Amino acid sequence: NMELTLALKNNIGEINRLHSFIEEVGEVFALPMKTVMNLNLVLEEAVTNVIMYAYPKEEHEYIHLTAKEQDGKLIFILTDSGKAFDPTQAPDADITLSADDRQIGGLGIFLIRKIMNEVKYERIDGKNVLTLEKEL
């Protein structure tokens, strides 16, 4: 059972490494280009949320991402040891507002829910664990 993992520093500069990882996931699981693009959007949003909300500015910690296929679903598990932050509790974006007036994070979870089939947040052993599933 194939499983790919990535460790990112909690730094926005790491987003390029995230994109490379998603492309690798796309190749390994033979995903259509559109799916890869959507996954890039979703994971960038999820990782950015962690960087912005879960960690104090100067704390150097890692964010771990695992991708695997199970029962016809692609599953991403994003884990960090930052402060508790449940992105699924962020209000959905008010899409009638201009981008500047929207709350940070709101559009993100709206987008994530739209693209992924299942989104689940848990706090386990002092860690944030976000599980994102997409049916293949």
Regions found by a protein language model. Give the residues of each.
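Glycine-rich/acidic phosphate-handling loop/turn and adjacent ATP-lid/helix
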Residues: 76-104
